[in-house]
């Protein structure tokens, strides 16, 4: 992997042709922390400290230990960035270490907010520390966005709807939005005709056949073949800061 290749004396000089070894490693560490954050939020206690070493019989780590470890990993990754050659092949930030730093600190803030639900003091302190860096996603130009050119690499929602016609916005949601004249409705789905919740696939297929304007998830502009996917945005960070300020 990127970290091993850029750390191994036999390969690091060759790897450096694609950018600073330190910066390649730092970016990989930030992404690793992000993915393990998703994993532990889904499944709680998971293999972490002994993972990615080629062993299958490894211990599970407590989520209470994983969160601080991920935050520490993000801090260490940011500290590792240097002024070396710009990393090539970076499809997110084109090797821009300032933007990667903003993403890392933004992840710290998001993690800290969730941590505060079980350890208020630790979560508050970590959020404040990340905020104090002044380097986090605060404008849409800094959003963590995955771009899809179409063709062999399509937006996942576009690919999903090539074969699935039974997934849409639930009628409970569209009903609430309609009843409250919710101006955000258009951002949730393609129409106000929601699918009744809990249908089997056959019943859902029958419903959408009888209701051709049923509500796809997201508006069409967000699920075209080449529509980008925003993973973490300045809007999310603004909501996080508002929640932390309560």
What are the residue ranges of the model-derived segments?
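Structured, solvent-exposed acidic/aromatic patches
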Residues: 1-246
């Amino acid at each position: 992997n990127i970290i091993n290749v850029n750390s191994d004396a036999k390969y690091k000089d060759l790897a450096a042709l694609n950018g600073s070894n330190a910066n390649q490693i730092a970016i990989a560490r930030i992404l690793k922390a992000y993915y393990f954050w998703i994993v532990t939020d889904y499944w709680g206690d998971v293999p972490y400290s002994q993972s990615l070493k080629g062993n299958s019989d490894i211990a599970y780590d407590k989520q209470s230990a994983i969160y601080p470890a991920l935050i520490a990993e993000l801090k260490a990754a940011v500290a590792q960035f240097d002024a070396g050659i710009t990393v090539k092949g970076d499809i997110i930030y084109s090797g821009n270490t300032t933007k990667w730093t903003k993403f890392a600190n933004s992840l710290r803030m998001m993690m800290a907010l969730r941590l505060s639900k079980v350890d208020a003091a630790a979560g508050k302190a970590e959020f404040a520390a990340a905020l104090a860096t002044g380097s986090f996603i605060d404008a849409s130009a800094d959003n963590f966005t995955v771009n899809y050119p179409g063709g062999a690499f399509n937006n996942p929602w576009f690919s999903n709807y090539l074969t699935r016609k039974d997934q849409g916005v639930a009628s409970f949601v569209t009903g609430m939005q309609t009843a409250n004249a919710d101006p955000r409705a258009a951002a949730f789905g393609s129409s106000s005709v929601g699918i009744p919740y809990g249908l089997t696939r056959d019943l859902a297929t029958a419903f959408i056949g009888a209701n051709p304007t049923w509500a796809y998830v997201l508006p069409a502009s967000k699920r075209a073949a080449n529509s980008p996917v925003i993973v973490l945005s300045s809007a999310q960070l603004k909501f996080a800061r508002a929640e932390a300020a309560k």
